Amino acid sequence: MIKNTIAIVNDSEVTTGSLPDGIISINAWEVDWDNLSLDDTYIILGGHMGSYDDKKFTYLQKEKQWLKKAINSDTKILGICLGSQLIADAVGGTAFLSDKIEFGFKDLNFVEEDPLFDDFKNSKVFSWHRDTFEIPPGATLIAKTEYPQIYKIKNTTALQFHPEIKLELFEAWYDSELSKQELESYDVKSEVNYLKDNFKQLEKSMINFYSKWISANSL
């Protein structure tokens, strides 16, 4: 059976970026969560909200309920940024607001070896988040910075950073006055220049990772 790869869009400004073509994007606030198939492959994208903002963004409640069911059914899932936080919340971890923003390109500190992520050893990864999480029971932490960055649980892979980053995405996220205010103490220009200068390597690392992830046998 041929499976679809479906990206769940939690925020209209946080799209698939430099992920490969052929991914079907659907908006989380329009999903019929009660009838969403467990047999396809899913990418849970990021967003400006927190996992705990589910009273304001009520679709997050149903999304987390579906994620719990899907993870326990060994549905193949990749969570990115908010996606990694929703996954943690769904299966016994805790997503929460940290005391500061993590912004910019960072080196990962690997605490477990897993060849799936080897390409992220060769380049920095981009983070922009204030929310973080405690990984859920039964999960394996693979890499971290000051915060957890990669973990796996069952057939689910979670990344706090943004492997899909590209200049157009960054510009969309940075466009608001709120974003400019929260980053006023950071050297944003330097990070943008790094993105421009290293995009080919960043994209290569992401594509190599994605190819290994999408082709890996499900549990």
Model regions and ranges:
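N-terminal beta1-alpha1 cap of cysteine-dependent amidohydrolase-like domains
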Residues: 1-73, 181-219
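Hydrophobic/aromatic beta-strand patches that form the interior of the parallel beta-sheet core
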Residues: 6-7, 24-26, 43, 78, ...
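Short, solvent-exposed loop/turn segments at secondary-structure junctions
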Residues: 12-13, 48-50, 85-86, 147-149, ...
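Glycine-rich, phosphate-binding/catalytic loops in enzymes
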Residues: 23, 58-62, 95-96, 143, ...
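Cysteine-nucleophile active-site neighborhood
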Residues: 45-112
